[in-house]
Curated annotation (Swiss-Prot):
Entry's localization field: Cytoplasm, Cytoskeleton, Flagellum axoneme
GO cellular component: motile cilium; radial spoke; Set1C/COMPASS complex
Entry similarity comment: Belongs to the dpy-30 family.
Superkingdom assignment: Eukaryota
Known function: Functions as part of axonemal radial spoke complexes that play an important part in the motility of sperm and cilia. Plays a crucial role during acrosome biogenesis.
Keywords from the named record: Cell projection, Cilium, Cytoplasm, Cytoskeleton, Flagellum
Protein name in UniProt: DPY30 domain-containing protein 1
Tissue expression profile of the protein: Brain and testis. Accumulates during late stage of spermiogenesis.
Species name: Homo sapiens (Human)
Major localization listed first in the record, in broad terms: cytoplasm
Length: 177
């Protein structure tokens, strides 16, 4: 059982150590073999530490890569979000401009409607005034103007001018002074 244990745990170490003793041929081979085994153990321990350190560095590198990928994804998402917000803001601005344009059009239509109503009212008034003037002109015509008979006298009409009254003249003099 001891030989199996020695072969399993110390077989490679003892084989290499004895080969080294045979190659170097020291004065005290037992002491040399003992020192060589200590050095071998130290080398194995250092190799294990180096392997652990390499594994740790590899894990840290993988974590750094994952973190970098995550940061890139976050930046991409943030950029996408900013673009969406900008698009939304532009859409809202366009809607606001469209709403203002519609309000301006409605105001213009209302103003145009008011102007058209006023024009229609003025037109109706003007027509009423024209009809009343025509009626007054017709009533103010002389019999000769109304009748188209041959031989009716054709006299021109003379309009009377308002003569200034004495009080109007006095007011004009006061204003001149």
């Amino acid at each position: 059982m001891e030989s199996i244990y020695l072969q399993k745990h110390l077989g490679a170490c003892l084989t290499q150590g004895l080969a080294e003793v045979a190659r170097v041929r020291p004065v005290d081979p037992i002491e040399y073999l003992a020192l060589w085994i200590y050095k071998y153990k130290e080398n194995v321990t250092m190799e294990q530490l180096r392997q652990k350190e390499m594994a740790k560095l590899e894990r840290e590198r993988e974590l750094a890569l994952m973190e970098q990928e995550m940061m890139e994804r976050l930046k991409a998402e943030e950029l996408l979000l900013q673009q969406q917000q900008l698009a939304l803001q532009l859409e809202l601005e366009m809607q606001e401009k469209e709403r203002q344009r519609i309000q301006e059009l409605q105001r213009a239509q209302e103003q145009l409607g008011k102007e058209m109503r006023m024009n229609m009212e003025n037109l109706v008034r003007n027509e009423d005034i024209l009809h009343s003037e025509e009626a007054t002109l017709d009533s103010g015509k002389t019999l000769a103007e109304i009748s188209d008979r041959y031989g009716a006298p054709n006299l021109s009409r003379v309009e009377e001018l308002d003569e200034p009254m004495f009080s109007d003249i006095a007011l004009n003099i006061d204003q001149d002074l």
